[in-house]
């Protein structure tokens, strides 16, 4: 069975040809350092861009970085052009290619490049709405990739997957989709895994729809790792899933331990399986979270045990590298008094119990610390949009030793926390303020968690090259041998008894997928969060049913839904009246709380009015807009009003930016 993953729309009029021609022209002129003034006119240079690196350049970069500085790139092979979005307003295009660059010492390096354009063509005029170019150096272990202090990885992202052994003598790292092992004691370098090298290089091997994650490395340099996404080669060729592998350094061979198949696309499988599968070689235990069920599988004894079931997104959390997990052990999301925390790397686990009559909610991990919330059922109330809510009265952070590291309680100000978003080292507390039995949105709270840097003999750090800017390297405190020996390619050995698990791919709850810069950027279970992320990446939000929820910039400047007037019936609240009126549209209801009024104009432009909550929990129905004004119906009076955008912004901000949208 062949699976295809795409979205098809048929807009009335598109200008794809003109936009693609512009992108190709811009791409060529940037490479050849031509038409500098012409390209500069399309840019918006400011402090939003880091002009000390070539790893990522964007529309805010200076023209020097757009035109590759002194790098003198030469394209290898063909440029792959991909139309990601095309509508009546803009076209999004992603180009993928390889370039060869020669550094100041004459050494040639190969880079994988992704170049993104969002372009508008209007009345014979081209507008560059967004531009982003990422590059990643392909490591090949040449002599020039080493100096007396360590390994020079070059221009790569800072968030590569890597692990250091306990003796701090060896490093296993992933670069450009390939897994490498360096042993400083012997000066040995091994390319452990590479999709192209499994059977030679061709178009299949160059497919970038897979990723590699290092799970662990021991002091004998044996490595446990995962390959997830689309399998272009091997016994699982053509499948999407995650393979768990063990590299035996002494034997120089790789053994497959398990393979979990998925019917989902690579991007979604990568997002889910990249965190929800963990294998510990020393115990032969594999933990898999599949379709809401957490399994512990003993590969040595061939035994499978269910640890927990019905785990919705709110009932568990996993660390970025997958080795830490927490889940509620009983009850529903807001009715569980116990959390079970597992360190799958060390095998340690412990539980946290709530005070009598209270419940606990898992929120996530940050730098190895666990975050959870305390819930008192007595705090249950309703939001201004009419939904029942039981917010957290306190948020606690506990370190890896299960000791309290911090706590956050705002109840003295009648403020409670609904959830916490984790982005790198930043925690964002989404909060509400209590007014009787009603909760209104209030200002977010931001907390930075700075990880203490542990002393290590191997450090992954930044350094600066005169011609190529910021680069990354592994620095070894004891230095490295001048002459490196590159080992033979490992032998692949299919598992004697490989475990295979199939994920059905049926979502039990609605999810919202954010696509930006031509790729999946994030997945959320709340539409409002997805819209805010899509704003940051100039992207789109797609629901689980493949419906467009929101698009950056794709709306008419003037629009009216032609919705009629209506009025509250006797004993009916303004919110109930609005929702009664919206029943005729037979549309899907979305909570878009936290979004801006400007973002919500797109939702109106989809053809349905939307509900906005003003101060004092008063609901109105937004029915249309112009470039300067917005029109709404107030069910309390039954009249239609038109006010300026800034006035309506003040009105909706007073209601906590609470919006209820509808799509169909």
Residue ranges of model-derived segments:
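A short hydrophobic beta-strand element
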Residues: 85-99, 221-227, 370-375, 429, ...
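Short loop/turn segments that connect beta-strands within beta-propeller blades
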Residues: 184-187, 249-250, 298-302, 343-347, ...
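Surface-exposed, charged secondary-structure patches
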Residues: 61-107, 210-219
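Conserved blade-ending motifs and adjacent loop-strand segments that build the rim/top face
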Residues: 313, 350-362, 403-423
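Conserved active-site-adjacent core of cysteine acyl-enzyme catalytic domains
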Residues: 561-664
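Core segments of small alpha/beta cavity-forming domains
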Residues: 3-70, 146-188, 196-197, 204-210, ...
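Beta-propeller fold detector
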Residues: 130-131, 189-198, 254-262, 305-309, ...
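Exposed beta-sheet edge and beta->alpha loop/turn motif
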Residues: 89-128, 132
């Amino acid at each position: 069975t062949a699976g295809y993953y795409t979205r098809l729309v048929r807009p009335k009029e598109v200008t794809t040809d003109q936009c693609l021609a512009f992108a190709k022209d811009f791409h060529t002129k940037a490479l050849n350092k031509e038409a500098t003034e012409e390209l500069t006119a399309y840019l918006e240079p400011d402090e939003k861009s880091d002009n000390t690196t070539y790893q990522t350049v964007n529309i805010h970069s200076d023209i020097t970085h757009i035109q590759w500085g002194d790098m003198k790139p030469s394209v290898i092979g063909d440029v792959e052009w991909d139309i990601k979005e095309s509508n009546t307003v803009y076209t999004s295009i992603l180009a993928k290619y390889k370039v060869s660059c020669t550094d100041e010492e004459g050494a040639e390096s190969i880079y994988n490049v992704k170049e993104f354009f969002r372009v508008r063509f209007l009345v014979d005029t081209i507008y560059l709405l967004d531009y982003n170019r990422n590059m990643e150096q392909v490591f090949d272990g040449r002599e020039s990739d080493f100096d007396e202090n360590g390994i020079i990885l070059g221009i790569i992202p800072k968030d590569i997957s890597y692990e250091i052994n306990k003796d701090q003598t060896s490093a296993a790292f992933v670069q450009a989709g390939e897994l490498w092992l360096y042993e400083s004691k012997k000066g040995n370098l091994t390319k452990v895994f590479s999709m192209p090298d499994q059977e030679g290089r061709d178009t299949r091997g160059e497919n970038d729809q897979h990723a590699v994650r290092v799970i662990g490395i021991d002091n004998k340099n044996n490595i446990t790792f995962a390959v997830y996404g689309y399998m272009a080669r091997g016994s699982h060729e053509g499948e999407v899933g995650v393979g768990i592998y063990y590299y035996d350094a002494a034997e120089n061979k790789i053994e497959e331990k398990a393979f979990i198949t998925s019917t989902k696309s690579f991007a979604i499988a990568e997002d889910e399986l990249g965190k929800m599968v963990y294998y510990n070689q020393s115990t032969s235990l594999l933990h898999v979270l599949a379709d809401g069920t957490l399994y512990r599988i003993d590969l040595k004894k061939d035994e499978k045990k269910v640890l927990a079931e019905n785990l919705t997104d709110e009932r568990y959390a996993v660390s970025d590298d997958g080795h830490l997990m927490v889940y509620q052990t009983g009850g529903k999301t807001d009715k569980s008094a116990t959390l079970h925390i597992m360190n799958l790397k060390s095998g340690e686990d412990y539980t946290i119990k709530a005070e009598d009559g209270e419940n606990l909610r898992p929120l996530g991990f940050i730098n190895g610390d666990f975050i959870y919330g305390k819930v008192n059922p007595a705090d249950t109330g309703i939001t201004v949009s009419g939904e029942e809510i039981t917010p957290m009265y306190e948020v606690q952070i506990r370190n890896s030793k299960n000791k309290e590291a911090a706590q956050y309680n705002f109840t003295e100000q009648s403020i409670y926390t609904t959830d916490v978003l984790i982005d790198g080292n930043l925690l964002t507390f989404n909060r509400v303020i209590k007014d009787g039995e009603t909760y209104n949105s209030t200002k977010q709270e931001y907390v930075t968690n700075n990880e203490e840097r542990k002393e290590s003999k191997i450090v992954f750090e930044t350094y600066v090259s005169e011609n190529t800017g910021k680069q990354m390297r592994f620095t070894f405190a004891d230095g490295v041998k001048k002459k490196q020996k590159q080992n033979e390619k490992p032998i692949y050995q299919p598992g004697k008894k490989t475990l295979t698990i199939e994920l059905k791919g049926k979502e039990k709850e609605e999810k919202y997928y954010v696509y930006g810069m031509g790729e999946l950027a994030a997945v959320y279970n709340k539409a409002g969060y997805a819209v805010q992320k899509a704003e940051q990446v100039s992207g789109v939000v797609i629901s689980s049913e493949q419906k467009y929820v929101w698009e950056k910039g794709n709306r008419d400047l003037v629009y009216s839904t032609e919705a009629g007037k209506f009025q509250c019936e006797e004993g009916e609240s303004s919110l109930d009246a609005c929702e009664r009126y919206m029943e005729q549209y037979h549309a899907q209801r979305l909570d878009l709380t936290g979004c801006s009024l400007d973002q919500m104009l797109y939702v109106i432009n989809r053809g349905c009015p939307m509900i906005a909550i003003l101060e004092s929990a008063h609901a109105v129905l937004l029915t249309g807009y112009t470039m300067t004004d917005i029109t709404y119906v107030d069910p309390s009076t039954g009249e239609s009003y038109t006010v300026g955008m800034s006035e309506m912004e003040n009105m909706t901000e007073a209601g906590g930016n609470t919006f209820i949208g509808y799509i169909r």
